[in-house]
Each structure stands twice: as C-alpha cells, then as structure tokens.
Amino acid sequence: MSEYLAQTPCKFTIWSSEIDLIRTNLLVNAHPLSTVGRLLQYIHYQIYKQLRAIYQPEEQCTNSEIPHTPLNSINTYFLSYEGRELSATCLLKDITSSSHPDSNHFIRLQLEKRTSPSGSAFDLEYDMEGEFNSMNIQFEINTLSSQRIFNSMEPNLPIGTTLARLEKLALERIKDFEKSAGNLCGIKEDHSVSDLQGFIIKGKQTPMFLNYGSDSDYYKDLNLVDLIGIDFAPAHNSFFTFLFKMNHEQNSHIANDEERFVLEFISDATLSITQMNVKPDTTVKQVKDFICSVYTHSLNLRRNDIKLIYKGQLLHENNFAGNSSKISEYIKEPHEVKVHVQINQEYTESGPGFWNEVFNNPNIFQFMPPDTRSQSPVSFAPTQGRSPAAIRGEERGIPYVTESGNDIVPTDELYRKCIINGDEVVFIPVSELNPQSSYLSVIKGDYGEIKIPISSNDYRINGDNILLSPSAIEQLESALNFKIERPRDSTLLHPSGEHVRAADNTSSANDNNTVENDESAWNRRVVRPLRNSFPLLLVLIRTFYLIGYNSLVPFFIILEFGSFLPWKYIILLSLLFIFRTVWNTQEVWNLWRDYLHLNEIDEVKFSQIKEFINSNSLTLNFYKKCKDTQSAIDLLMIPNLHEQRLSVYSKYDIEYDTNTPDVGQLNLLFIKVLSGEIPKDALDELFKEFFELYETTRNMNTLYPQDSLNELLLMIWKESQKKDINTLPKYRRWFQTLCSQIAEHNVLDVVLRYIIPDPVNDRVITAVIKNFVLFWVTLLPYVKEKLDDIVAQRARDREQPAPSAQQQENEDEALIIPDEEEPTATGAQPHLYIPDED
C-alpha cells in the first residue's frame, strides 16, 4: 500500500452537456495526488448511484448493470478542461496549480461521451459496489515500551466511520498489543477512551484535542470524509495515518508495594518520565528498557547505548556469574534513589514532527485550547497622526499566514472583481481592463526610441519627475534588458496610486524632510552595514574561540619555553599550532561551510541525486560508508519506511519480528549485500523508497533530522560526482587506486592502533616515542576523529568484566582432559600422563 498525506483538497464542479447524466453540477473534493482517471471513476460511481435511486427506488440492486439508463461503460467517457481532454494519468494538482493557485476556487470540468473508441490501453473499469465505500487507515499510537510506537493497519473502513468508532478501534488494538511481553504500562486492560488525549492526521499542521468539553461530542460524530477533507480515497491501495497520543502509567501494584522504592533519573537528555517504581527483583535490563521507552530524542535507542551510574559505580546488566543483575544488588537504601543516566551521543538529536512534540512535551494535550470567542478588555486611546509611509511600513512588517500556517506573500498586481452572466464572479487584472492609451518613451543609444505601453494606474507625474509603479519598472527593465537600482530612500508609486517612500519611515506626519533624509542616511551608512556584518562577526568570534580553546596546551608550552628560542621561531611555531588547530577542528570547517552555504542542496543538485539513485548507480563502497554512518541508518529506520523494510526482509529471506525494532535486521541486510550473499538491488530498492517518500513530504513539515538528511544527500552527491577511474589520467588513476586500497584495508586504523599509547602495556620510553609521533600524525585530516574512536573502543574493552579464576581453570581443564577415550586413527587408545609429585 502507498501512504498519502492529508493535504488541502482540490475542489471541482462537474457538469455535462447530457442532461440525463448530470442534472445538477456535482461538487467533489479530491486529493491533489489523485489522478484524473480516479476522479472519473468517482464521478461515474456518483451518477450510477443517482440513476439507481431513480430507476430502482425500491428494488435491491444485485449487480452493477441498470437497464434502460443513459449510463454506459466508464471507458466511453472522459473529462475535459477548457475544451481540452485530460489524460487519465494526469494528477489533479497539475490542473489546479497551473490556472487556479487558490485552493478555495472550484475548477469547472466537463464530462463528455466519446464519439469513437479512444484506443487507450488504460482500463478504467472498477468495482461499483465497493470501490468508493471504504478507506484504508493506519493507526500509530505511542506506547510505554521499547518499541515506542505501535502501528496497526485497518483495511476497508467504511467512509462513514466516525471518530468515536476510530477511538474504539485504536483502544482495542492497543489493549491487544499491551498483552505482549515488554510493555511497561500498568493500565493495560483498564485503558478507556478517555486515555486518548488527542490525534493528528499525518500531513496536517495542527492536532485535534479529545475529551476537553461538551464540543467533543460534535467532533466524535465526524466521519472519515469530514476528518480527511476528501470524498474518496486517492488510489485503490492508498491509506492515511492517524497518530493518537495516549496516556500511560506505571504499574500501580508496584507503587503500592511496601518493598518498592523509587528511582529518580538525572540526565542531560530529556525523559518524558523521570521516576520509576521498582521492586527488589527488578533487573538493570528492565530499568534500561524503561529509559528506552521514555527517551524523547530518538525512537531507536537500545540498552547498549545507556549507562546507569549510581554513586560513581557503573550498573552492569549481568553479574560475574552471567545472570541478570538486580537493581537491589547495587542500591540498598529504602527511600528515593538518584541514578545518573548517560546516553550515547549519537542519539542526542531531536527529530521533528508530531511524535517529537509529544515526547518532548508530554503535557501538550492536558489543557483545553483557548476559546477564541472570549474577548479581552480593550482600552480606547486617541491615535496619533502618522504618515501613509509609516502606516505602510508597519503593514509590510506584519506577517500574514493561512489557517494551515503557510506564509501569504502579497504581490503588487491588482485585480478587479467582475461578474459574468449575472452570477459568475471572476477576478481580472486591472491592466487588462484599462485601455493602453499611454506610452512611456525611452531613448536607448543607437537603438532609437522605445515605446512601452502602460496604464494610467502605473505612473504619476510629479513636477519634473515621473513616478512609476513596480509593475511598470519591471516592464521597463524587461524592455531595456538591464536592472534598475532602487535606492531605499526613493519615492515609488504604490499600485493603489499613492506615493509611498521605499525607506522605513517611523516618524510622524509633521516631521520635516531634513529629519527623514538624515535618518535614512544614518540607516544606510551605519545601521545597515552593522546589521549585514553581524552574522559574519558571530562566525569570526566563534572561530577565534574554538582556535583558542583547542590551542591552550600548545600556547602554554610556547609561553614557558619561548625564552629559549628566537622570535621568528616562536612566531613560526605559533602559526604552525594555529594551522594545526584549524585543520583538525571540524567545528570550524562546519561553521564556515554553513556561513558560505557550501553544503546546501539546491534543486539542480537534488535532481542529479534523484537521477543517480534511480539509475541504480550507488556502489558497494557507498553502502559501506552508509553502514558505518549512524545518521544514514537513522534515516532508513524512520517509521514511514517500516512496511518497505519488512518487504525487503521478506523478499531476501531475512528473519524479522514485526513487534520489535528492526535495526539488527537492517545491519544484517548491509552485511549480506557487502559480502555478496544478496544482490545490491536490495539496498537500491530501499533507497529509492526512501527518496520517493522524502520527495513527497519535502515541502511540508519534515519527518527527518535536517542535519542527518543533509549529510546523506551530500554523500550521495559526492558519489555521483566521482569520475570513472578509467577516464582519469594515469597519475590520478594510480593515486585513486592507492587511496581506495588504503580505505578498503583500513590502513590508517591499523597504523593508529600501534601509534596510540596504551598506558596498561607500554613502557615509559615507548609511550614518550608514541606521543611524539602521534603529535605529528594528528596534523593529518580526520585523524583526530579516528583517534577518539579507538580510545573509546579501548575504554569499552577494559570495561568488559574479566572471567573469574574458577572459570579460567575450568576452561583449561576442558582443553587438557578429553571427554571420553576414543581410539585414535591408528587404533591405539590415548593415555594422559600425569607426573608424580616430588
């Protein structure tokens, strides 16, 4: 199935020259991504219902054929717009965007019958009885478990299904889900409809509150058509997603237990619940699972990414015997206990969207929305006289938005409301209604005189000056083929005919022109340069701070031993240290890349990326980079790709569990593709699905972490810019081959493991030599990141508990003593010789 987002519907009014088919215009609300063929099917279905009610008012219709009616097969009809036949595969948004940008405007389409067969291979036949009576709905409900989000597909729900029925269905599904293991909610079977606090349909901008007043009964009577805003499903296999916010609580039996105690979590990360009721037999794994369920920054957090620290001691999941550690083994106090929680830094980025707002603000649905009908007291005061320029300057600063939150950008073009045939209202540009009786004559060098027709509203004569409107200036620029500079303190002609100063003017009407000119000059010479240079100033300050912060130790060494060296060597060493710091500080590079917009993906680059992915040109080396890049894994693990991932797992025989996060299966998919067990097409298919989803939702509230998305797009764009190695010159071909082999065999990692000092095993002289070599090696790019990874890996290895002495003895005995005496290959029996003790 394909997921569709709830968008502003396209509105159509359908008429036909055949009065027997459509007696009164049909009004239809359709999804913008639906096709003309789908709309034609729905219109045909509506006509079929009306004719069946007329010709068979009391009979039970058993088939789709109605005898003696003017309705024929759907393939004999077509829709036309402004006399042009519309293709059945044309999207409805392409009709509205080209001619009627206003979504509230109805588009007139005509239904006509073909005089001859079209010969099209596109068959529009459909099931008249059940095609347009239902929709597919998917539920997403938050849970108190490691899975965080529960998905449930509800196929073929009647379009008359009310919100009250949807709430009951969601309640039934969450009750069934919480019967499974791993759920920490203590309510379970006692959940009621009142626990549903609100919901939102994916694609809409604002959520809908539930159970907050008497008006909730009205909302609960709304059906799917009212909620989504369209009359029919945009495709046969389409579905919409309802995201419900549900209230969950911890187990009340534990809270009332006398032996229980409370863990209070202290962490820099945001947790939706900061306390946990535990019993003496609660394990450390269960505590980590609880933290995974209440962590607000990521949906893919695992136990291995969490560290619990109590009074400086790390709480391990397993004890030395290999059994699960209980929380009571570390904590003996019977009262509230503070436990520090440390989260892996890879999961500190907060993702956008509805669930992020819910997890970061658990009280988002706790309050009734403000009543817009209530009014606050208004104090009336006499207004001071202000110039029209000041008023218009304030109007330009007021942002206007639609009900859905989209910005409204006013233009300079004026329209006049007109009436056609006494009832139809249209808006026509003023320039089309005014006769072109005036011309602007311009002498352009050797080309002679150029005449530009303008209307009377586009110019005013003020003494020796001609004031032009913005539209007239654009005509003049187009005719002369150059740009006219507009000074901020100039006077322009507003389209309404008023003279308006282009400069910001906040002075009153009785200020003189000298004060206005002085203020404009001050803004132009002082305020504007300071305002424009402020971002650059912040970048420079941040850069100097990072250089100084990362160069404290080298500058301290120079300060202490500088008296032994000449000044020229001190300056040279200082410059060398500064160069080294800038080279190895990734934050400085990222800071200037963002300021200079070097990492931005424009439409041209995005088109190249899309074409590169669709051509299956991604290489195994690229997929290897993606496997080692956590941001790429997080993007492929978004909930919207859940069905596509499961489809790939099923296609290539990868075992998976639909009730648990499939991060392990995704990593296994990468491993099998890189090892050659599975063809590369598996990952190609998954990446195509991801970018199809991203292209659909990129202009809306994004579902993806922006930094991670930009990183992945840059990786793909750089991959697409790589030239074929066979087309390069010989010296570059040799260099590329050498770099590829070094990267493939991880030569840098191997060298660094020998260079980085090991305090446990290295002697003093060896450590000094390694530190000296490491100092110069860190001048190379990307070495610092590799260095941090290796040091962190060594620290994790040291934290692993060593086997006890008894276990080591048992392993040694198992290696020495055979289990049973079996004959050898020569037929002789083996004997164990144990020397006598002295």
Curated annotation (Swiss-Prot):
Protein name stated in the entry: U1 SNP1-associating protein 1
Any GO BP: positive regulation of protein autoubiquitination
Membrane side Extracellular: residue ranges: 560-563
Disruption phenotype: Impaired degradation of proteins with misfolded lumenal domains such as CPY*, a mutant, misfolded form of carboxypeptidase Y which is a known ERAD-L substrate. Impaired degradation of proteins with misfolded intramembrane domains. Impaired trans-ubiquitination and degradation of the HRD1 ligase. Degradation of proteins with misfolded cytosolic domains is not affected. Interaction of substrate with HRD1 is reduced; in USA1 and YOS9 double mutants this interaction is completely abolished.
Coiled-coil region list: none
Major localization listed first in the record, in broad terms: endoplasmic reticulum
Gene name as annotated: USA1
UniProt-listed CDD domains: Usa1_DBD
Domain commentary: The ubiquitin-like domain is required for HRD1 trans-ubiquitination and degradation. Reported to be involved in ERAD-M but not ERAD-L function. However, a contradictory report states that it is not required for either ERAD-L or ERAD-M function. Reported to be required for HRD1 oligomer formation. However, a contradictory report does not observe any defects in oligomerization following deletion of the domain.
Superkingdom of this protein's organism: Eukaryota
Keyword Mitochondrion recorded: no
InterPro entries in the record: Ubiquitin-like_dom (IPR000626), Ubiquitin-like_domsf (IPR029071)
A GO term from the CC aspect: endoplasmic reticulum
Domain Ubiquitin-like, first and last residues per copy: 259-318
Membrane topology (Cytoplasmic): 1-536, 584-838
Transmembrane feature ranges: 537-559, 564-583
Record PTM Phosphoserine, positions in chain: S374, S376, S379
Chain intervals with Acidic residues compositional bias: 809-823
Interaction with DER1: region residues: 584-838
Alphabetical UniProt keywords: Endoplasmic reticulum, Membrane, Phosphoprotein, Transmembrane, Transmembrane helix
Ranges where the record places region Required for ERAD-L function and HRD1 oligomer formation: 437-490
